[in-house]
């Protein structure tokens, strides 16, 4: 087994090309995929999907020296029933594959995950984007109903 030194830089060009090509094909073929954009300064892609339970889901794919990170903004910080919301989401974490619910700096909820570069291929990109979409569609409404019950009249 070859160990890579922490300061040894990995050539990211092949991964960038793979992600670019996959996203271009998906944008052409997948009617749920509305937009793809890229920030080349930080090797980050923005993927916007049309949803049913939530109007839009935006996924950020960030290519780093060791991992591909992916995340989506799930919902704002709950206004009420904080414990119930966080318990609901933590219990869902047990069922998720390759992702987890996380609380951001501003207390908003995110779905986040990462994979080693060695795992990045078209099948995994499809799994990441598809799973993110499915998890948002499945868990968004119940979490929102708990955290914003008064506002939603629930």
Regions found by a protein language model. Name each.
Residues 144-154:
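Short, highly charged C-terminal tails/helix-capping segments
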Residues 102-134:
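A short, solvent-exposed beta-edge/loop patch
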Residues 69-110:
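Short, internal acidic amphipathic alpha-helical interface segments
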Residues 9, 13, 79-80, 119-126:
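Ordered, soluble secondary-structure elements with a strong preference for glycine-centered loop motifs
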Residues 32, 141-145:
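Intrinsically disordered or highly flexible coil/loop and linker segments, enriched in small
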Residues 132-142:
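Amphipathic, Lys/Arg-enriched alpha-helical patches that create a basic surface
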Residues 1-56, 104:
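Charge-rich, low-complexity N-terminal segments
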Residues 49-83:
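The feature represents the first ordered module of a protein
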């Amino acid at each position: 087994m070859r160990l890579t030194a922490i300061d040894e830089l990995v050539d990211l060009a092949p991964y960038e090309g793979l992600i670019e090509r996959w996203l271009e094909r998906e944008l052409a073929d997948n009617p749920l995929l509305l937009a793809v954009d890229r920030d080349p300064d930080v090797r980050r892609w923005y993927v916007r999907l049309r949803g049913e339970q939530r109007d839009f889901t935006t996924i950020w794919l960030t290519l780093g020296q060791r991992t591909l990170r992916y995340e989506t903004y799930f919902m704002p910080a709950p206004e009420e029933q904080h414990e119930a919301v966080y318990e609901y989401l933590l219990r869902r974490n047990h069922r998720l594959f390759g992702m987890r619910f996380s609380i951001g700096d501003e207390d908003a909820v995110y779905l986040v995950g990462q994979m080693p570069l060695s795992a990045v291929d078209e099948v995994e990109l499809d799994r990441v984007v598809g799973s993110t979409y499915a998890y948002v569609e499945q868990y968004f409404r119940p979490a929102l109903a708990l955290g914003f019950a008064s506002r939603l009249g629930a």
